[in-house]
């Protein structure tokens, strides 16, 4: 009789841990870089404080800053998702679909390591 696999093995979880940690490191670096740009930590010039610059670039600058804030928020959410994935790995619940309780395919977890739903569950969830 076949037994249904209810969780990934410890070796598989360690493989996923390496993937998650790699993505987390990159995400944190990207977030830090975005925050540097937002807070002008990399510049020593006065170009963005001169009245001429402000008059000409106010709209563009405002839009760019809004986009950067949005990017930073998305990156922060991604980091939180990856940190939650690490907790699920520690708890040995990583890769289990939160709706069906079945294992999420490895291919999906490699592509989206913070996933908590299989593609099918996600589509069904959106339809409701």
Name every feature range the model reports, one short phrase each.
Residues 107-112:
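Short Cys/His-rich "knuckle" micro-motifs
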Residues 113-123:
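Cysteine-rich micro-motifs
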Residues 89-95:
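Glycine-centered tight-turn and secondary-structure capping sites
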